[in-house]
Amino acid sequence: MVRHFRPCYMSWVLTVNRFLTRLALCAWLSCLSSLGCSDPVSSAGAPAPPSSTPGCRAPAGVSDAPRTIDETVALINALPKPLSLPCFLESLARPLQVHASYSVFSAQPAQGARSPRIFLFQDPTVMSIVPEGEGASLLEFGEQRPEFRSLKAEIVFPVAAALDPSAPFDKLMFDSQITTCGGCHAGELQESEISGVRRFVSRALRPQPGDRVSVQSLDHELAICDRSLEPQRCAMLDGLLGWGSVTERDFPVGMATFGG
């Protein structure tokens, strides 16, 4: 009897390619230097948000301000399925604090200043999104730990059914010992295990200050976004910016930057 291993082989190839891509990005990052920081801008004076999209609100008893990866899974599981990433963003309590960066040196790269990588602060967790391109289907996490380390995780959208607690971690493994995050985030160590899936912490990194994109610029991109041409990108920007106050926030200055 001939056994066909092609599906497993292709899955392994994709995992290896993903890890090598992250590793290659880190090599580029090592050549970069720190730039200046722009002044923070706030959209706190924006008009009142419109009525919420049906279903894109946390039901009673479920927090719409998740502070941990586990609490985020609980919110996702409480929202209607299939759940889009824009709907999840809309469901989050306002005000939101964000930091946007146009750097392409990431496994979730920005598509220029018009579609930057956007970090959302839900202390002690930092989530990240990008409105278009590679990584636009991902919600990435860094749940902060002492000494500028963080627990890494990611969730792929749309979410079709309730997630297991281990779901944010089970796609990150490169092999039995390290994750795909370990190529860029040094000092990776196992912190715990859940449902047989290992969870790893590693060095937390912040974007280069000079790559910052202001909230004012993001608001402008939402205002001019053509929904007939870029429906998903417009939906992502609207999910983030269209439902209440969004303000800028800095990362801790003691945290290392991408590229040193």
Model features per residue range: what roles?
Residues 1-20:
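N-terminal secretory signal peptides that target proteins for export/translocation
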Residues 21-24, 41-45, 55-57, 75:
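Short, intrinsically disordered, low-complexity terminal segments
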Residues 191-196:
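Short Cys/His-rich "knuckle" micro-motifs
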Residues 178-189:
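The canonical Cys-X-X-Cys-His
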Residues 22-34:
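Bacterial N-terminal signal peptides
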Residues 35-51:
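Ser/Thr-rich, Pro/Gly/Ala-heavy low-complexity intrinsically disordered linkers and tails
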Residues 4, 26-29, 46-50:
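Short stretches within intrinsically disordered, low-complexity N-terminal or propeptide regions
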Residues 49-176, 199-260:
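Extracytoplasmic c-type cytochrome modules immediately beyond a signal peptide or single-pass transmembrane anchor
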